Amino acid sequence: MYEFKFADIGEGIHEGTVLQWNFKVGDKVKEGETLVIVETDKVNAELPSPVDGTIVSLGAKEGEEIHVGQIIVTIDDGTGTPAAAPAPAQVSAPTPAPAAAPQVAAPAASGDIYDFKFADIGEGIHEGTILQWNFKVGDKVKEGETLVVVETDKVNAELPSPVDGTILKLGKAEGEVIHVGETVVLIGQNGATLEQAQAPKAEAPVSEPKKGAGVVGEIEVSDDIIGGSEEVHVVATTGKVLASPVARKLASDLGVDIATIKGSGEQGRVMKDDVQNSKAPAEAQAPVQQTQAPAQAAASVAPSFAAAGKPQGDVEVVKITRLRKAVSNAMTRSKSIIPETVLMDEINVDALVNFRNEAKGLAESKGIKLTYMAFIAKAVLIALKEFPMFNASFNHDTDEVYIKKFINLGMAVDTPDGLIVPNIKNADRLSVFELASQVRSLADDTIARKISMDQQTGGTFTITNFGSAGIAFGTPVINYPELAILGIGKIDRKPWVVGNEIKIAHTLPLSLAVDHRIIDGADGGRFLMRVKELLTNPTLLLLS
């Protein structure tokens, strides 16, 4: 019997909402098949089954919340009876005991239960929402098949089954929130049943538990496998590398064999820092080390206040999505911490319009849609090199400013579910054409909710385009812990004084918000003037 629990995947996520079950009780499920889709603050996560088996029970219904550590589903994977998962407790000094000879796992007639828990993969994510189950109780599942999709603050994660077996119980229903440490699913192996899992057990000496998996995407984490009889079984480990998704991606980018890295996380899980410390240039290490300290201090600064109650009269009650809740929390945190000031200007971009029109044909021949945003981004990147304080963050606990030697340019994207701010890593190394291509693909992936957690973390400066909504000026909210954000208005045609004449010109409104604790208005004005100079003379963009 396998209890699949909702795992901690970092980024402050503690819960999720079950959106959709793909299986029902009694269904056979294969390992890796998507069991359920869970919505979290950031993503809709598909949770794959960790085992083959039959779905015995669903832990939550569609629309219900599931918390980290809660059981998503119980799967009969034919392995036997689960024991109660050990509760966290204060550990006293152990009494010395004679070393016992290694025990060999003997076949258990009643089978084993695999308790698949939602794992902590770092990034501050503590919960997620079950979006979709691909298996139901009673289904058979194969190792690697997607059990369920879980939405977290950052990604929609497909959780694959860590073992073959039968689904005995789902820890949560679609739409429910699951927390780190909660059971995602119970998977039965070797004929285990849910009744065996629920049966009281005689106390037995505790043996070394098997390392199973609580998975987000492709990440294996530790878990418990519970013996199906009163005998104590020592089960061999899976041999898979336990690692966070960010660590896996970074290892791949750096060409590091993740199997050779010693993990510092829980039960040896390889984290981002482990990969960076093994083989990473200082440039790659800086984003992690320099952005975390301010973020940790943020929570204590936000004020508390009474919530508005339900008004009297005829009202419609709408539950906000997890993404909208995440946006709400981020905006509240930023406005509570940052005393921002906003500078505005409007510039004549006739030269930029003509320059873009001349370059569009060449861009199209390369399969690139050349937008104004690519030129604006390039101008901002050049200005950030010249004004490094705008590419920094401030730790108000230590009174330290972290000036970053890399530029990860954030692009605010309006999605049907809410605002998401992914970023382009090392954007200053890209040409205008390369920026155009990346901006387009990043926006498409964000709207489709296909971006990774890595693409949503480590930003150093953000551009937001409220011109797409037909707005000229605005007061953009700084993406904490960054120190500034540039708002772009709509390009319009209006009368403009050129020399001693009034002509119709293309104009671009700019709104720059800065953290006034670190950046003064005069500095903001100089930064904005440099961006203005580059956009009114677009050939300068090619000389950088």
Curated annotation (Swiss-Prot):
Active-site residues from the entry: H516
Pfam families hit by this protein: 2-oxoacid_dh, Biotin_lipoyl, E3_binding
Class of this enzyme: transferase
Cofactor notes: Binds 2 lipoyl cofactors covalently.
Ranges for domain Peripheral subunit-binding (PSBD): 242-279
Domain of life per record: Bacteria
Reactions catalysed according to its record: N(6)-[(R)-dihydrolipoyl]-L-lysyl-[protein] + acetyl-CoA = N(6)-[(R)-S(8)-acetyldihydrolipoyl]-L-lysyl-[protein] + CoA
Cofactor dependence: (R)-lipoate
Residues carrying N6-lipoyllysine: K42, K154
Classification via CDD domains: lipoyl_domain
Annotated ranges, domain Lipoyl-binding: 1-76, 113-188
Transmembrane domains' residue ranges: none
GO molecular function, one term: dihydrolipoyllysine-residue acetyltransferase activity
The family this protein is said to belong to: Belongs to the 2-oxoacid dehydrogenase family.
Function description: The pyruvate dehydrogenase complex catalyzes the overall conversion of pyruvate to acetyl-CoA and CO(2). It contains multiple copies of three enzymatic components: pyruvate dehydrogenase (E1), dihydrolipoamide acetyltransferase (E2) and lipoamide dehydrogenase (E3).
Subunit structure: Forms a 24-polypeptide structural core with octahedral symmetry.
Name of the molecule in the record: Dihydrolipoyllysine-residue acetyltransferase component of pyruvate dehydrogenase complex
